């Protein structure tokens, strides 16, 4: 029997998961039904079509969310961590670097990750915009103010990110529970008035709708998918809450409320087809509009906050895995290490979100842009999951195809339907994704070229030390720590120091930081020290992509291996690389110029590794790529 403490902890995590994980999918009822029957799609609002659409949505929630994500994908975790970056790292570790699948998996996973950024721009825009559009249902007087109010809410949201969400975050769960309870109650009220909508629970109506409408049904799928936006968040947030609380939050709270509300909106439209302009806000009558606008705006802000936090987390992982340059990362909570803030990402994302709101102008126009990013990410997740099941878990090929093939067909159908919107807004997330994909691949390849250049000119460290101590230089008091990459040979900073100062500290440590394709490396495994002789040491510090790099903390860990450091007697020598584009070799020249610009604006190693600035000596070196 579970102890009371474990039960209360599970309940608290489940409540928190309701607030963070299900904000995006929880706000989908604001706009999904409205979009399916919009005039642009040409789908007639008949009882038969209505039953078919509601059946598609309910069974989509069962198949895509309950079966695919909650049952299957949550099992494919990278040491407890989820998200497409973690899944990509897991899939890549399932095959060898020489495998024909390695590069395609890298490209696919990376593009899926960049589409998440496109999704993270549209989610705040469409969620807040559709919530505030409820004012227009009450009176057309508010029409000119919808976009300005949306922009004001979003600017306010991004402006407070630096303060963190630790204080208000505890209210996210209770507010979203109220939101889901409201969805359920509204649904039940309308189902009671038109119980025939319950026929939609029979999947025959979904299949009959697809068969009877063919092309129109295919177009409608592009809007039906809006009901499943945010499904990826179940997987992405697994590391914060664990699989069990996420499953409980889905089956006990989110899924029943969503299913009831979609059935309720269907019941409303059976009775009042004219409510199709905005069925969500007309479920309880005119008296409820203003309270619903207030509650839905809070829910939309929470959904947006979860997406913004997810963007920060994804960026931190991308930096650690070598796909983005180092950036300034601030920790906004003393107790929760996952609470981070990245200023550059925050303000850039805010600018793009505001542009999207002003440029598209309505949730209907934004909805066209939404589906492509979501369905493409779903598709990539399914493919990566197949490789994990097949090559890491070593399951039988037929079993792997059976477990993912069905979902692959559904994902391809939804993605194909959304590709019809390519010229009606779908280009927007694809453009964002393509730009970020190019930047990430360019940075990754650029770092490889820098590494190859340094390795080509590297002097083997042990040979150099052996020759150096034949006629040793003057030793001065203190400890010198030289940062060096893997297989770099003698650090350039050391060569410069010996060349100009002609001295060597009495103790010399060569420090190499390694990033592993796992979320976390425990502190007991982070530091390894090798004696090189003559008071010289090689110190290897290993982190996972969700660990916080902290060299002073690593030096404290070195005490357990007999190496103690006094910070005021320790100097860190770091080579500051100036990268120069070379038209003869490497990447295309335009990519080299992009890489050079990214290198110039990258955060310094000292800041990134939290090394005290007053203990750092930087020495310049030029590298051609």
Swiss-Prot record:
Superkingdom classification of source: Bacteria
Main location: membrane
Family annotation (InterPro entries): K+_transporter, K_trans_C, K_trans_N, Kup
Topological relation to the membrane, as annotated: Multi-pass membrane protein
Catalytic activity line of the entry: K(+)(in) + H(+)(in) = K(+)(out) + H(+)(out)
Keyword entries, A-Z: Cell inner membrane, Cell membrane, Ion transport, Membrane, Potassium, Potassium transport, Symport, Transmembrane, Transmembrane helix, Transport
Subcellular location: Cell inner membrane
TM annotation in the entry: 10-30, 50-70, 102-122, 142-162, 172-192, 215-235, 250-270, 284-304, 340-360, 369-389, 397-417, 422-442
Gene Ontology annotations for the cellular component aspect, listed alphabetically: plasma membrane
GO function terms (MF aspect): potassium ion transmembrane transporter activity; symporter activity
Keyword Transmembrane belongs to the record: yes
Entry's family note: Belongs to the HAK/KUP transporter (TC 2.A.72) family.
Function: Transport of potassium into the cell. Likely operates as a K(+):H(+) symporter.
PANTHER family on file: LOW AFFINITY POTASSIUM TRANSPORT SYSTEM PROTEIN KUP, OSMOTIC STRESS POTASSIUM TRANSPORTER
Protein name: Probable potassium transport system protein Kup
Name of the coding gene: kup
């Amino acid at each position: 029997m579970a102890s009371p403490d474990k039960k209360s902890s599970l309940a608290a995590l489940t409540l928190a998961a309701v607030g963070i994980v299900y904000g995006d999918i929880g706000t989908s009822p604001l706009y999904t039904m409205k979009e399916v029957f919009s005039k642009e799609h040409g789908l007639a609002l008949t009882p038969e079509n209505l039953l078919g659409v509601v059946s598609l949505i309910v069974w989509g929630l069962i198949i895509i969310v309950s079966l695919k994500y909650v049952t299957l994908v949550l099992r494919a975790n990278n040491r407890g961590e989820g998200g497409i970056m973690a899944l990509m790292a897991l899939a890549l570790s399932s095959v060898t670097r020489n495998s024909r699948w390695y590069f395609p998996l890298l490209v696919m996973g990376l593009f899926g990750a960049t589409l998440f950024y496109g999704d993270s721009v549209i989610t705040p825009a469409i969620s807040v915009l559709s919530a505030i559009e409820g004012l227009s249902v009450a009176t057309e007087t508010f029409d000119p103010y919808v976009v300005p109010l949306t922009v004001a809410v979003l600017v306010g949201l991004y402006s407070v990110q630096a303060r963190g969400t630790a204080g208000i975050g505890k209210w996210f769960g209770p507010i979203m529970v109220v939101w889901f309870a409201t969805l359920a109650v509204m649904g039940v009220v309308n189902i009671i008035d038109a119980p025939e909508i319950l026929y939609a629970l029979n999947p025959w109506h979904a299949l009959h709708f697809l068969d009877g409408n063919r092309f129109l049904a295919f177009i409608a799928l592009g809007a039906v998918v809006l009901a499943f936006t945010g499904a990826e968040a179940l997987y992405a947030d697994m590391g914060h809450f664990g699989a069990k609380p996420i499953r409980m939050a889905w089956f006990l709270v989110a899924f029943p409320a969503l299913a009831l509300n979609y059935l309720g909106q269907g019941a409303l439209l059976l009775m009042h087809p004219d409510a199709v302009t905005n069925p969500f806000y007309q479920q309880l009558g005119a008296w409820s509009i203003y309270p619903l606008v207030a509650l839905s705006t809070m829910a939309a802000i929470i959904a947006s906050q979860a997406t913004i936090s997810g963007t920060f987390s994804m960026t931190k992982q991308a930096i650690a895995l070598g796909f983005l340059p180092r950036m300034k990362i601030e920790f906004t909570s003393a107790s929760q290490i996952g609470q981070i803030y990245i200023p550059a990402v925050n303000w850039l994302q805010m600018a793009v979100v505001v542009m999207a709101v002003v440029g598209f102008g309505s949730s209907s126009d934004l909805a066209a842009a939404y589906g492509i990013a979501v369905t493409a990410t779903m598709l990539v997740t399914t493919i990566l999951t197949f490789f994990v099941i097949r090559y890491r878990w070593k399951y039988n090929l037929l079993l792997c195809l059976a477990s993912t093939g069905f979902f692959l067909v559904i994902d391809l159908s939804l993605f194909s339907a959304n590709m019809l919107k390519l010229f009606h807004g779908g280009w927007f997330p694809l453009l964002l994704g393509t730009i970020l994909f190019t930047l990430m691949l360019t940075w990754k390849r650029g770092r490889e070229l820098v590494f190859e250049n340094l390795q080509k000119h590297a002097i083997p460290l042990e040979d150099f030390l052996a020759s150096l101590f034949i006629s040793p230089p003057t030793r001065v008091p203190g400890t010198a720590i030289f940062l060096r990459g893997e297989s770099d040979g003698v650090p350039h900073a050391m060569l410069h120091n010996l060349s100009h100062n002609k001295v060597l500290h009495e103790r010399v440590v060569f420090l190499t930081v390694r990033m592993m394709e796992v979320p976390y490396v425990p502190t007991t495994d982070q530091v390894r020290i090798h004696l090189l002789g003559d008071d010289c040491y090689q110190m290897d510090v290993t982190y996972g992509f969700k660990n916080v790099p902290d060299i002073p903390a690593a030096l404290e860990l070195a005490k357990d291996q007999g190496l103690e450091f006094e910070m005021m007697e320790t100097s860190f020598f770091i080579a500051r690389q100036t990268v120069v584009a070379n038209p003869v070799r490497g990447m295309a020249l335009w990519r080299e110029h992009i890489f050079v610009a990214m290198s110039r604006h990258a955060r310094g190693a000292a800041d990134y590794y939290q090394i005290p600035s007053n203990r750092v000596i930087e020495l310049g070196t030029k590298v051609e790529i």
